Amino acid sequence: MGHKVHPTGIRLGIAKDWNSKWYANKAEFASYLAADLKVREMLRKKLAQAGVSKILIERPAKTARVTIHTARPGVVIGKRGEDIEKLRKEVSELMGVPAHINVTEVRKPELDAQLVAESIAQQLERRIMFRRAMKRSVGNAMRLGALGIKVNVAGRLNGAEIARSEWYREGRVPLHTLRADIDYGFAEASTTYGIIGIKVWIYKGEVFDFSQVGQEKQDDSPRNDRNDRGDRGDRPSRPAREAR
């Protein structure tokens, strides 16, 4: 199942956290969710050149707090904070409550899966060979400390008539390990031949160390009825069947 489901969705509450944090009753839940989708869509369109990694939304006490993780905070803020003030007003109108916008810088964009996927998409739109773009991104991530990275591109690669998918991997990407910190990103490249999808998985290590806990559970667990050699012991003899 690790290869089928979304890497972030299966780890929510274990190694990953939600991008939206708020509580709502049944009457308000749908409107809150729709507002979050509109805000994210608007911000990604406005900040297409800012390298936005993710957008976190919180709703404390009839207000809204939006945190934008970006590789280029100067593009988001603008001169003397003019651009971010315009964004704040638009977000407040969409959400219907006073909004505050915080900007967080992504210091290593080469280790952010979403930014890596968008970088590969931009290279493909500039007609750079997909294998070169993949290997360049993989090399940069491994050089900066990633334990593993996998890149998958799908579509009409190099203008081929039949669409196909190719992937490249270095290191380990344990998708079945729930405590693994795996960052996932997806982007689309609009080329003259059609849409090319890019998926990126980056493994950064384990979030929790369960080795000691597992050892204690193993020591405290009751043993089965076996002797030291691992045998199951003597079985009760069955009565012999009478010959017909």
From Swiss-Prot:
Residues 213-244 are annotated as: Disordered. Residues 39-107 form the KH type-2 domain. The keyword Transcription regulation does not apply. GO terms for biological process: translation. Binds the lower part of the 30S subunit head. Binds mRNA in the 70S ribosome, positioning it for translation. InterPro entries: KH_dom, KH_dom-like_a/b, KH_dom_type_2, KH_sf_prok-type, Ribosomal_S3_C_sf, Ribosomal_uS3_bac-typ, Ribosomal_uS3_C, Ribosomal_uS3_CS. Part of the 30S ribosomal subunit. Forms a tight complex with proteins S10 and S14. GO terms for molecular function: mRNA binding; rRNA binding; structural constituent of ribosome. SUPFAM superfamilies: Prokaryotic type KH domain (KH-domain type II), Ribosomal protein S3 C-terminal domain. This is Small ribosomal subunit protein uS3. Pfam families: KH_2, Ribosomal_S3_C. NCBIfam families: rpsC_bact. Keywords: Ribonucleoprotein, Ribosomal protein, RNA-binding, rRNA-binding. The keyword rRNA-binding applies. Belongs to the universal ribosomal protein uS3 family. GO terms for cellular component: cytosolic small ribosomal subunit. Residues 216-244 have a biased composition (Basic and acidic residues).
